[in-house]
Amino acid sequence: MKNTLQFHHAALRVDKIDTAVEWYVATLGAVVCYQDDTWALLEVGKISIALVSPNQHPAHIAFACENAGEYGTLAYHRDGSASVYIEDPFGNTIELVETPPGTEC
């Protein structure tokens, strides 16, 4: 299961996606890459931050990899990506993401 991993994003839990997006855009100059009712992906400088609804997604760190399916069953998302969530031995959630070719953020 050797894979080349690259940092993809850190996910922060927020109660109101719209309000959080507005704050990150106005305060930090974030660029919105994707947004729906349960999460948003923002680019702040060279870092991506996911803002996630507490009842929909866990707080986590994500890595992009070519074959996330080797770590478990892929879940397919509305933004075109697919991922697997795993936990380290200490209960921290890690997401392994496969992004479609040509994804901007």
Indicate where each model-derived feature is located.
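Short glycine/proline-centered loop/turn elements that form peptide/ligand docking sites
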Residues: 19, 37-40
